[in-house]
Design a protein with these regions (language model features):
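Conserved short alpha-helical segments that host acidic/polar catalytic motifs at enzyme active sites
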Residues: 1-208, 214-274, 279, 368
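Flexible loop/turn segments at secondary-structure boundaries
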Residues: 12, 101, 175-176, 196-197, ...
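A short acidic (Asp/Glu
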Residues: 44-46, 170-171, 286-289, 381-383
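An acidic- and aromatic-residue-enriched active-site/binding cleft used to recognize and process polar
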Residues: 163, 171-172, 281, 303-304, ...
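Secondary-structure transition/capping motifs at alpha-helix termini
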Residues: 268-273, 292-299, 333-337, 359-368
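Extended, hydrophobic alpha-helical segments in both membrane/secreted and soluble proteins
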Residues: 276, 283-290, 294, 298, ...
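Short, glycine/charge-rich flexible loops or terminal/linker lids adjacent to PRPP-binding catalytic cores
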Residues: 295-341, 379-384
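A short, conserved beta-to-alpha structural element at the edge of catalytic cores
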Residues: 359-384
Length: 384
């Protein structure tokens, strides 16, 4: 996944930008970046966050970067934001999305005279750079964004920062969210709605599918109207979204309670657990919803050790990721031994980690372990 945040204010915005981007750390584990525009022009910083959290890596940059307009991101893939110089002028761009027809789009830009792209490790092309190249094929940034929305097979939500403001564009089917917040002397734009709440912003606008707005320190202007066809990612409520966020007016935590409640209604009279538990972190709210509806006791038979195992430290190697996941879970023997446990997870994708967690509980003395996924069975892979 990935997430981003932008600010256009009448005064220096770097602290709001820094904390706003940091509030998206649950959406990515590989790279973070910030770009600002001020009296000294454009400034940018990009760092790896694989072994250290965003805040730690960017503390020095906060002291050095200045500007009243800024954008930043947390990314699981390419380094960004990128600084672009073109016939449209200078701008910075950051994206959240997935391009399924990348090779076909590369052929389009090559055939139109684009000679090269910067290659990333593994021979991959930076998708954000490709998006910028496609935008620059048109006469204005807005026309370029519309062109990208039409031509990409996949999803693409983006922020583009000029020397005067920020263009914010939501994916054409609204698969990923985009919110605008407002306070007295600034506007912000964010993937996560909760990211600006602690900084004095209030909700101003949630963009619709394919909608484009232009944000300056003084105003928010709709430059391309929203479309009606909405296909938002349901996994935002199940897994990706932070509990305090809301999408399309529906809070993540409340939705997870409802999922757990519906599971309990379906199970009524078929199981009598001693303990209802959730797999940390996203399974916990589902389990609370189940326990509240069923009347069975909610407890934490195992607890995730977080002081030295933050989510931002997650190796890219799958075997190492699974080992780290195991090491995080610490059992509470008195809540496991000779107990019938009902374990609720947000979903089952590969099933590897859930199987190991179940074995872990049995090895810790559980009498029975029953598993309930809060998400319906995943029958087809999502290409977005």
């Amino acid at each position: 996944m990935g997430g981003f945040f932008g600010v256009a204010g009448k005064t220096d915005c770097i602290l709001d930008l820094f904390y706003g981007v940091d509030y998206h750390s649950h959406l990515g584990t590989r790279r973070g970046g910030m770009a600002t525009f001020g009296k000294g022009g454009f400034h940018r910083a990009i760092h790896s966050i694989e072994n250290s959290p965003f805040r730690t890596k960017f503390e020095r940059d906060v002291e050095e970067m200045k500007g009243n307009i800024g954008i930043g991101c947390i990314s699981d893939f390419e380094p960004q934001p990128l600084l672009i110089q073109s016939h449209l002028g200078s701008f910075a761009i950051t994206t959240v999305g997935k391009i399924n027809n990348l090779d076909a789009l590369l052929n389009i830009v090559y055939e139109n005279g684009h000679t090269h792209f910067q290659e990333m490790s593994g021979g991959q092309i930076n998708a954000t750079e490709l998006v910028a190249s496609l935008i620059c094929k048109k006469e204005t940034i807005v026309e370029g964004i519309r062109y990208v929305q039409e031509i990409i097979d996949g999803s693409m939500t983006m922020l583009i920062m000029t020397n005067e403001g920020i263009y914010a564009a939501r994916d054409r089917y609204g698969r990923t969210p985009l919110m605008v917040g407002k306070k007295e002397d600034a506007y912000c734009v964010s993937f996560e709605s909760f990211a600006y709440m602690s900084m004095g912003y209030s909700d101003y606008k949630e963009l619709g599918p394919a909608e484009i707005v232009y944000i300056t320190p003084e105003s928010v202007e709709v430059v391309s109207e929203a479309k009606k066809d909405m296909k938002i990612c349901s996994f935002l409520w199940v897994y990706y979204g932070y509990p305090t966020s809301s999408y399309e007016g529906v809070n993540v935590e409340e939705m997870r309670y409802k999922c757990g409640s519906m599971l309990a209604k379906r199970d009524k009279g078929t199981i009598e657990p001693d303990v209802v538990a959730g797999v940390p972190d996203s399974g916990i709210a589902h389990a609370i919803g189940y326990a509240n509806e069923s009347g069975y006791r909610y407890a934490r038979p195992f607890i995730k050790y977080t002081p030295t195992w933050s989510r931002s430290f997650m190796p890219t190697n799958q075997a190492q990721r699974e080992k780290v996941a195991r090491m995080k879970l610490i059992p509470v023997p008195s809540l496991i031994e000779d107990k019938r446990l009902l374990l609720i997870d947000d979903s089952i994708v590969r099933g590897t980690q859930l199987r190991e967690t179940t074995e872990f509980l049995y090895n810790s003395g559980a009498k029975e372990v029953h598993v309930r996924p809060a998400c319906p069975p995943l029958l087809y892979g999502c290409k977005y």
